[in-house]
Design a protein with these regions (language model features):
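OB-fold single-stranded nucleic acid-binding module
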Residues: 305-308, 312, 326, 345-453
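N-terminal leader/linker segments that initiate helical-solenoid repeat arrays
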Residues: 25-82
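Pro/Ala/Gly-rich low-complexity, hydrophilic intrinsically disordered segments
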Residues: 155-163, 257-325, 431-453
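Structural motif corresponding to the intra-repeat A-B loop/turn of tetratricopeptide repeats
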Residues: 53, 90, 129-134, 138, ...
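TPR/TPR-like (Sel1-like) alpha-helical repeat modules
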Residues: 103-105, 139-156, 225-251, 258-262, ...
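Short solvent-exposed coil/turn linkers within tandem alpha-helical repeat scaffolds
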Residues: 69-77, 105-115, 154-177, 206-213, ...
Length: 453
């Protein structure tokens, strides 16, 4: 798998309010509990003083004083909630997680709404607090995954309040962003743990409930590519979907997608990946799931096509257009053919080269009757300039200038490009077989096209 580093503090979860299940404010809960009066007036006043303090550092001192003076207070749950909000304000995220875990350890003593709110806060700040190099990094990720999965499960099962004016369908719809949030968090932890099947499942859940979540699609793509064996095409689709939705660092992800496709296909013409990526991003904008009919050929697929191709099948496959032409071109762009025979239809001298317009066909009779070229064969008559096509341009052949219209030609070369209509296959890095080049004395005496060797 090609690795792309992604920062745990770079792409973060968007803040989310679980508006469908509002938890009671800390003050309201404490005031409601006054009817039970299980705490003293000094405890209550100390708590209210801490709650009313607007300076976070001063509030923290008041909370610490409260815990020192009243370590067994029945208000401790509300104190812990204030600790969580205060440490969040101070951006001390490890402490937020510490107090969230303390509250979650209370189990059934927490009402469901408060538990969900605490899970949400814990999950939301985790990417800020997580240190991948910490000795307990694996344990941190496991706890984060478990908290996120619990949050998704609790929210999915949370019943509609009796006084809600929403229909069941509306209430279920309102919960979807929250469930997606928790699923995305679980997927993030699974991805870091390299549990790719679990990450795929989590991110698919997240994107099903929030189809516009570009970050989850990005991470789903990484999960597919990290699986064993890699689910490459699904991974490419998910990455393209994330780019279409405007994921942060889209240009970098697009470059990564291009490189990943090149590694997967190993084509000889790297520039073809640019067109593929553009097309893929456009298509992925129409659907979160890859259509069963869409595919990207692997290197093995392209090698199979190339191995079964002849110059005649290249003509028919490329001229036919459609998916067959795309596949054939991916397989054969830049391919070298050792022996191609045809008849020269026209000679076009250039600056240091000659372009032979050539026809190749299935039979000698077809070749001799041809009047229209289906190949453009470029042969250098002087040393090719720096930057000429091909990594190892063919040596100059000045003697090819003696070849004329209607002469037969036999050459080896590399397919460079093609025009679909009228069809014309362009060749470069060409070497004409010396045996078909007439001697000076024989120039103008036409020879029929030689048989392919």
């Amino acid at each position: 798998m090609m690795q792309m580093r992604f920062a745990t503090k770079g792409i973060l979860f968007t803040a989310l309010a679980l508006i469908c299940i509002p938890a009671r404010p800390v003050a309201a809960q404490a005031q409601q509990d006054q009817s039970k009066v299980t705490y003293t007036i000094p405890e209550y006043n100390a708590f209210q003083a801490a709650r009313a303090e607007t300076n976070a550092q001063n509030r923290l001192k008041l909370l610490d004083d409260f815990v020192t003076k009243f370590p067994s207070s029945t208000l401790m749950t509300y104190v812990d909630q204030l600790y969580i909000s205060t440490y969040t304000e101070l951006k001390n995220y490890p402490k937020v997680i510490e107090y969230a875990d303390k509250m979650l350890a209370m189990g059934d003593k927490l009402d469901t709404a408060t538990r969900l709110q605490t899970l949400q806060t814990r999950v939301q700040v985790f990417p800020f607090a997580f240190n991948a190099k910490a000795p307990d990094a694996h344990d941190q990720l496991t706890k984060e995954r478990d908290a996120a999965k619990e949050g998704a499960d609790l929210l999915a099962k949370f019943p509609k309040p009796a006084d809600s004016k929403l229909t069941d369908e509306q209430f279920a719809e309102q919960k979807k962003p929250g469930i997606a949030f928790f699923d995305a968090a679980a997927g993030f932890a699974d991805l870091q743990l390299k549990d790719y099947p679990a990450a795929i499942e989590a991110f698919k859940g997240a994107t099903a409930n929030n189809p516009k979540d570009a970050i989850s699609y990005y991470r789903l793509g990484l999960s597919y590519l990290g699986a064993t064996p890699p689910q490459s095409v699904d991974g490419f689709w998910a990455l393209a979907r994330s780019i279409n939705l405007g994921v942060p660092d889209a240009d970098k992800i697009k470059d990564y997608l291009r490189k990943a496709i090149l590694v997967y296909e190993q084509p000889q013409c790297d520039n073809l990946a640019d067109q593929q990526v553009t097309e893929l991003i456009t298509l992925a904008g129409t659907s979160g799931d890859r259509p069963a009919t869409y595919n990207i050929p692997s290197a093995a697929d392209l090698q199979k096509v190339a191995g079964a191709s002849t110059i005649l099948t290249v003509f028919s496959d490329l001229a036919g257009g459609g998916d067959k032409a795309k596949l054939t071109w991916l397989a054969l762009c830049g391919a070298q053919f050792p022996s191609v025979a045809g008849k020269i239809i026209e000679v076009k001298p250039g600056n240091g080269f000659v372009n032979f317009e050539v026809f190749a066909g299935a039979s000698d009779d077809e070749i001799q009757k041809a009047t229209t070229a289906n190949m453009d064969v470029k042969v250098w008559t002087t040393a090719p300039p720096a930057g000429a096509a091909g990594t190892t341009p063919a040596a100059a052949q000045p003697d090819v200038a003696r070849l004329a219209k209607d002469d037969g030609i036999l050459f080896s070369g590399t397919i460079a490009s093609y025009d679909p209509s009228p069809f014309l296959l362009h060749w470069d890095q060409v070497k004409v077989d010396p045996s078909v080049i007439p001697e000076k004395a024989d120039a103008g005496k036409h020879k029929k096209a030689p048989a392919k060797q």
